[in-house]
Curated annotation (Swiss-Prot):
Assembly with partners or alone: F-type ATPases have 2 components, CF(1) - the catalytic core - and CF(0) - the membrane proton channel. CF(1) has five subunits: alpha(3), beta(3), gamma(1), delta(1), epsilon(1). CF(0) has three main subunits: a(1), b(2) and c(9-12). The alpha and beta chains form an alternating ring which encloses part of the gamma chain. CF(1) is attached to CF(0) by a central stalk formed by the gamma and epsilon chains, while a peripheral stalk is formed by the delta and b chains.
InterPro entries noted in UniProt: AAA+_ATPase (IPR003593), ATP-synt_VA_C (IPR055190), ATP_synth_F1_bsu (IPR005722), ATPase_a/bsu_AS (IPR020003), ATPase_alpha/beta_chains (IPR050053), ATPase_F1/V1/A1_a/bsu_N (IPR004100), ATPase_F1/V1/A1_a/bsu_N_sf (IPR036121), ATPase_F1/V1/A1_a/bsu_nucl-bd (IPR000194)
Catalysed conversion reaction: ATP + H2O + 4 H(+)(in) = ADP + phosphate + 5 H(+)(out)
Major location (coarse): membrane
PROSITE patterns the record matches: ATPASE_ALPHA_BETA
Enzyme class: translocase
Organism ancestry: Bacteria, Pseudomonadati, Pseudomonadota, Gammaproteobacteria, Alteromonadales
Protein location: Cell inner membrane
Positions of ATP binding: 151-158
Keywords: ATP synthesis, ATP-binding, Cell inner membrane, Cell membrane, CF(1), Hydrogen ion transport, Ion transport, Membrane, Nucleotide-binding, Translocase, Transport
The protein's Enzyme Commission number: 7.1.2.2
Record organism: Pseudoalteromonas translucida (strain TAC 125)
Protein name: ATP synthase subunit beta
SUPFAM superfamilies according to UniProt: C-terminal domain of alpha and beta subunits of F1 ATP synthase (SSF47917), N-terminal domain of alpha and beta subunits of F1 ATP synthase (SSF50615), P-loop containing nucleoside triphosphate hydrolases (SSF52540)
Amino acid sequence: MSLGKVVQIIGAVVDIEFPQNNVPAVYDALRVTDGDLTGLTLEVQQQLGGGVVRTIAMGTTDGLRRGASVMNTGESIQVPVGKATLGRIMNVLGEPIDEAGPIGEEDRMSIHRAAPTYEEQSSSVELLETGIKVIDLVCPFAKGGKVGLFGGAGVGKTVNMMELIRNIAIEHSGYSVFAGVGERTREGNDFYHEMNDSNVLDKVSLVYGQMNEPPGNRLRVALTGLTMAEKFRDEGRDVLFFVDNIYRYTLAGTEVSALLGRMPSAVGYQPTLAEEMGVLQERIASTKTGSITSIQAVYVPADDLTDPSPATTFAHLDATVVLSRDIASLGIYPAVDPLDSSSRQLDPQVIGQEHYDTARGVQTVLQRYKELKDIIAILGMDELSDEDKQLVSRARKIQRFLSQPFFVAEVFTGASGKYVSLKDTISGFKGILNGEFDDMPEQAFYMVGSIEEAQEKAKSM
């Protein structure tokens, strides 16, 4: 329990001098013990020599003065874990921020842990049904897998994420952990009330480090959430871990890296980008005891998927759901691009031949339609062969049938949400591909659940 004193403050980075025979280790948590900011937690990042350590503040440093005394706790940041965290909102340090009293946890764990060893890990090919047609058809999720929702600003990552949580949390009765990393406070608030209204709040732990927080909070809050998820997994449960947004985690790392004086790499990102991403992603793993299924929203800067941040994230995922601005501009929601999205599970040996053939058939028709669009724009539909005209008609029906009303968007759209089973999804698209619905107007397929609903809608048109 050595004491040190603050010698330099540069924004969120604070240098502290300790006796040379008692210097804190990297990742040790330090606590300010006097002045206006008593209780502020700092995390050691570097040892500079001469007894001085460089730390990142887990809160605002406004009002911190040089000479303030700081105590070494002798351990890394410890957060509450276990059932006591369910239904609660916590910050990066595991402190409650929902004004509902103390957490009352029985156990605490360090946010810095090693990933499961090679022997402990296990893989699964069991599918996780989401009830969202386009995802179940084209990029199915695996239980215990990692999924990324990629998209630029305002194409619906958070709404898709909330719908997935609602569907999976209600249909799958396990526990979930939600880490809000550098997102809007309003969305965090909406999310809390959405979970409360759906009666699934008692199965979700919420950890928030919002946009207005210092970079230290946003960098560590994903690890706090992950630690809680790991505890549920180690108890033998199948847990869902949601992160919104992984890009803000990278961005916080960039801010911290610049403050620590590291030389930036490509596009101004931190030189340790791949390592920081790896440290987080490798811990999100399923073991022989239990599984973590992770769904992560990934903001794509300027809609450029080759940007180093989304590109680094791609390498760790089993399924990628790419949201497209072009599809959103057509009014088709969820705006998932069925040609850009992919999944490792899309294999006939995993999902079965019928599902595989239907998914590939849908992609083939949409790809051909994409190629014909230029010809249609220049020469018009009349110049196409009869075969191509039929293909375009089916493609437009498929495109509209890939849309569906969401439960979490009911307040905005006025349409009641739909959960579509995988069996209904496959039979619907198979029917369109086989020409069973060629006589129906394409508008009948827009914003419906199953194909039976489209048939009902067509009767009234």
